Amino acid sequence: LILLMLALMPLCAFAQNGWNDALYKQIEQNVNEPVFKDKTYDVTKYGASPKATAAKNQKAINKAIEECSKKGGGKVVVPAGTYNTGAIRLKSNVNLEIQKDAKLQFVFDKTLYPIVKTRWEGMDCMNYSPCVYAYGEKNIAITGEGTIDGGGSNATWWKWCGKDRFGWTPQLEESQKIGRPLLFKLAEAGTDIEKRDMKDKGLRPQLINLYNCEGIAIKNVTLLNSPFWVIHPLLSKNILVKGVKIWNEGPNGDGCDPESCENVIIDGCTFHTGDDCIAIKSGRNRDGLKWNIPSQNIIIRNCTMEDGHGGVVIGSEISGGVKNVFAENCEMDSPNLDRVLRIKTNTCRGGVTENIYVRNITVGQCGEAVMRINLAYEPNEAAERGHIPTVRNVYMSNVTCKKSKYGVLINGLDDADEIYNIHVDNCTFDGVQDQAVKRTGKSHDIFFNNLVVNGSTVLLDPPYKHYSEWMTHSEMKRAPQSYLLDFAKKPRWSYTIGTELEPMLDTYRAYKDESILNYCKAYPDKMIAADGTITGYKYEDFNLDNCRTGHFLINLYQLYPQPSILKGMKTIFKQLENQPRTKEGVFW
């Protein structure tokens, strides 16, 4: 069995892992951590206090940020203590530092969250300000060893999601059951953003939303209980998210969702979320297609996904496309983790997702599939159809998983073949409970190289219809010269070669592959001279092993009637006629 597997391996559809080192290094060079003036603004000097009301603290913190920015920037410090507050607006050249043992505690009071321009599930709108918000700013940061708590719970923001288990009741007047379909309708109609007012419509704000900003760092803070998505950079560039700890089990509690962003590094973060850990986006349907700005040049590395629906997710709001995403050296393990790499989209979205690289990921378990590509996500979505999405150039390598339902799950479209050039290389998936690979709809050029599922090598599309062809070409690839089939360093007349070439010739007879016949011809052409002399053969040795290869010559002569082959056969037959025998008449 081991020899068989070794023989088959060269025929597996081989693919390099596709990792683009040059682009990876270019992204690293483009993402420079912001630098700030060495000047400190303590929020307590502006009236903030653990004993103050949320409204007073909000005013004080925003005043400190405003003054810091106007004076050329620096560090706005939140010292130890818990500060109730409402929405905070970050300004250019400001580093908001939440120090150790400090907590910004955002309260559930709509009056403290003014209406601002943002996006909600990929649709442009005017909605409640995110807890920390910036628009059109440069050189900004959120740092420190402290905590930002969005105050999400079943008693506050989360009940607006419209689900019983998060506190929603039919008596609740404000929830996304009202706002979400309204925003869908306005977005599909192309309504001006300023007229898409979601006040009192139940659309929860993000914890951090940095819109149209450049030069961003979010480092070392702990982020808890977001009303909605946790970190949401939007239409922004040059972003570093490093050493952040996220704990958010609320509805739609995505950890970090860069949307239509360029040059992003997410490094050394820990995610414990009620939805996707990282979800890359670029706008939904009409809005995303109108802006048509991809998320691109993103590095995800050294992260731990403790809990969440998906580890690295692309979609579903990706109408603007996604490209050049690198994920490496991460650990994932949770019964609630459904997928390691997930790409989800549909024909309302359109867009091209390409150049996705995933390597060196260790997974304890995931609920559904290690890799899931789905072009039929949310099939009942009420939006304009006909925008065919494309997913191509996806490379996964050196990923291990101890338990899942599927290894690879690909759901293409029935009427368009837009999933292709997908590579899974040197991966081991154990404990796969259903199918190693499941495909629906159309897809092509799916390549597996050394994909081992439950201890067995998996090939999606065997390169030959018949095992005999497969084995023959495997050996031809291993030893391009038939006269070296027996692993010798120089040609010799060999029992081993004869016993292997004979079934190869049978394969030619069955399937008429001329390359096999030519391969077989090469041995006698090399070994038998015109006069019938056989290289390496000695009549006087009376070695019966040398005669075994004559079987092959007899069969080959019927297809390749060369005089030299006939003379060679006669030479061997002469030995048989004179071979010493026992008294019973059989050969020694």
Regions found by a protein language model. Name each.
Residues L1-M5:
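Sec-dependent signal peptide recognition
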Residues A7-N95, Q99-N220, F228, K242-V244, ...:
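Extracellular "leader-to-stem" segments immediately downstream of a signal peptide or signal-anchor
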Residues K39, G74, G81, G86, ...:
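The right-handed parallel beta-helix/beta-solenoid scaffold, focusing on the short coil/turn
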Residues G73, T85-I88, V107-D109, Y128-S129, ...:
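Short glycine/acidic-rich loop motifs that flank beta-strands on beta-rich extracellular proteins
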Residues K100-D101, K138-G146, E214-L224, K237-N248, ...:
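Right-handed parallel beta-helix
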Residues I115-K117, E121, K521-L556:
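Blade-loop segments of beta-propeller domains
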Residues I318, N336-V458:
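Extracellular beta-rich repeat passengers
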Residues L459-G532, Q562-T571, Q575-Q579, K583-E584:
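Low-complexity, Ser/Thr/Pro/Gly-enriched N-terminal "stalk/linker" regions
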